[in-house]
């Protein structure tokens, strides 16, 4: 079979599955559908070569003495001869606290070992050792305590890629306050909901942009928000985090009542389609669930430098810049750019000798457009991607330019990585990979039965024998949503996929219509709610539309009130209104006017038909 330049040998009985809603199913050139045709490439029936294992283990040395690693007190693992994990088990988790048990212990063992290389917007270089992180996090914990922040209090962090994020997080972990990372593009409308839903009492916020102004507006409706700390700037009514924190002691002792294990540690707001964002709650064991992400997917080198491109408001930042990487004693590279520019970041690979790299497909596409062949990427030994489906042509262009094969993975804000192409194991182009050892994964059809090979089903986690480290504990403050997602012994992800005869999973899309655009997960309901505020809008349905660069973009289908005439000016007015009343990345890039919207028998909008 051949589609464009892509060729695939089909066996007797194989079928071709095309889903126009799935990024992997996009077949178009210049915005027009292509003719789909097949060519016989193997008429003689010659044997098809077996999949070969990745050669990454030939270029990165095996770990010399893993028993000397700090994580060995909490993690046991078995590998095959290629270094692929056969099993990963956790121990001594009852009081596990990442800040104390990993970061502080590495600092004791190797105080000068590099933890993070941070590049500021002005290109200022800052190097933080694990001892720096230990001391600064102790200062932060003491500072937070002096402000009256205590165990169980909710603290939001909107810090972009500021280096203060890392030791503020560690300080909160030590104190027992619950950390809530968030994006700096949120507006007052978004913040007000989040402050009240999570009962946020304190916020640490960057001075960059206008987010502090938005916080001040939202605070008028959120009396529980008492403490506001600003980083890298000053504002009336805000305390200076940088100046005040450094005045506190670098000693913060752990005691028998220190938080850990099953205690609540972290919350993420995650988008849905039938309401405002849900709050995925994680305990202290969550950090352990990221070990395999760094060790066997990112394949980090304890003597190397890992780059994951992600804002700290995304769960992906904790996947790729924090827990797993530091458990493996690898340093992370952070560049605090204002707006992503491939031409800006590509020269840094050679300059700083970045060894492992992870980025969402959107940014990989931008790099390809910049012509990666012009840059020296020879230091990079391993590449990964997640967040949305990776276009095959991007995969091939990177392989041609670097000799590296980009390995995909899958997970959620509610979890760590569930499915992935792991080091040393076979992998297939276009596949998310196979389930990782700590998760028992299945696909269930609409009848709740395991989906046959080649058939679509919802990705579920089997928790009948207990939930794995890394899976969330439920949606905070929403027992109904928790039961909807977690019932009959399974956690239902809401994501659809199919699997082949070798057990490889292929992503289809969200069952609940969440839009994935440039790595963001955008819930239609939030956008619909804003658009419906306009007096001339009768009905509105928001859905995803395919986009070559972003994967998907927001599309708004609108029914106008009687007497309102559709026009291009009206479309622009609607787009500007959404930009002003919610985070700008959520605005509908496509606006269409309709006479009516498709609905189910019960009156629900059928977004998959928009």
Would you name each region that the model predicts?
Residues 126-131, 265-289:
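Conserved AMP-binding A3 loop
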């Amino acid at each position: 079979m051949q589609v464009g330049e892509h060729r695939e040998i089909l066996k007797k009985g194989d079928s071709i599955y095309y889903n126009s809603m799935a990024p992997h199913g996009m077949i178009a050139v210049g915005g027009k559908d292509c003719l789909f045709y097949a060519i016989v490439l193997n008429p003689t029936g010659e044997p098809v070569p077996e999949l070969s294992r990745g050669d990454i283990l030939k270029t990165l040395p095996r770990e010399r003495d893993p028993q000397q690693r700090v994580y060995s007190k909490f993690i046991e693992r078995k590998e095959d001869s290629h270094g692929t994990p056969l099993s990963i088990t956790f121990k001594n988790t009852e009081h596990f606290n990442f800040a104390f048990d990993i970061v502080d212990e590495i600092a004791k063992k190797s105080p000068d070992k590099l933890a993070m290389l941070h590049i500021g917007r002005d290109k200022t270089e800052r190097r933080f050792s694990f001892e720096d992180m230990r001391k600064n996090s102790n200062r932060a914990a003491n500072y937070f305590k002096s402000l009256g922040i205590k165990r169980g209090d909710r603290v939001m962090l909107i810090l972009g890629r500021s280096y203060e994020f890392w030791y503020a997080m560690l300080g909160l972990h030590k104190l027992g306050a619950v950390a809530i990372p968030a994006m700096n593009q949120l507006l007052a409308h978004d913040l007000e909901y989040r402050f009240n839903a999570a009962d946020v009492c304190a916020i640490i916020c960057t001075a960059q942009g206008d987010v502090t102004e938005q916080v001040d507006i939202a605070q008028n409706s959120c009396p529980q928000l008492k403490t506001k700390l600003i980083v890298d700037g000053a504002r009336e009514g805000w305390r200076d985090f940088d100046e005040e924190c450094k005045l506190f002691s670098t000693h913060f002792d752990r005691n028998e009542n220190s938080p850990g294990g099953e205690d609540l540690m972290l919350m993420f707001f995650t988008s849905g389609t039938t309401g405002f964002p849900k709050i995925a709650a994680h305990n202290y064991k969550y950090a352990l669930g990221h070990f395999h992400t760094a060790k066997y997917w990112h394949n980090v080198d304890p003597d190397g430098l890992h780059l994951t491109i992600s804002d700290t408001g995304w769960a992906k930042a904790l996947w790729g810049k924090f827990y797993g990487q530091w458990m493996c004693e690898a340093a992370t590279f952070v560049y605090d750019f204002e707006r992503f520019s491939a031409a800006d970041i590509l020269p840094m690979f050679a300059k700083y000798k970045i060894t492992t790299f992870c980025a969402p497909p959107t940014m990989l596409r931008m790099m390809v457009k910049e012509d990666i062949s012009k840059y020296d990427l020879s230091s990079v030994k391993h590449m990964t991607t997640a967040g949305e489906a990776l276009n095959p042509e991007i995969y091939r262009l990177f392989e041609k330019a670097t000799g590296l094969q980009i390995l995909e993975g899958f997970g959620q804000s509610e979890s760590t990585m569930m499915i992935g192409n792991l080091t040393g194991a076979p992998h297939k182009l276009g596949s998310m990979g196979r389930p990782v050892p700590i998760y028992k994964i299945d696909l269930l059809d609409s009848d709740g039965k395991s989906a046959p090979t080649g058939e679509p089903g919802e990705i579920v986690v089997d928790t009948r024998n207990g939930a794995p480290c890394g899976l969330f504990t439920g949606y905070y403050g929403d027992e109904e949503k928790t039961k909807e997602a977690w019932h009959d012994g399974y956690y239902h992800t809401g994501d659809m996929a199919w699997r082949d005869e070798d057990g490889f999973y292929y992503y289809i899309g969200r069952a609940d219509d969440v839009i994935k655009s440039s790595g963001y997960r955008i819930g239609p309901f939030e956008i619909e709610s804003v658009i419906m505020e306009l007096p001339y809008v009768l009905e509105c349905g928001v859905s995803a539309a395919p986009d070559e660069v972003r994967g998907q973009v927001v599309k708004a289908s609108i029914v106008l009130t009687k007497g309102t005439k559709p026009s291009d000016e009206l479309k622009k007015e609607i787009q500007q209104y959404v930009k002003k009343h919610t985070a700008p990345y959520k605005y509908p890039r496509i606006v269409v006017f309709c006479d009516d919207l498709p609905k189910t028998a019960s009156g629900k909008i059928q977004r998959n038909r928009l």
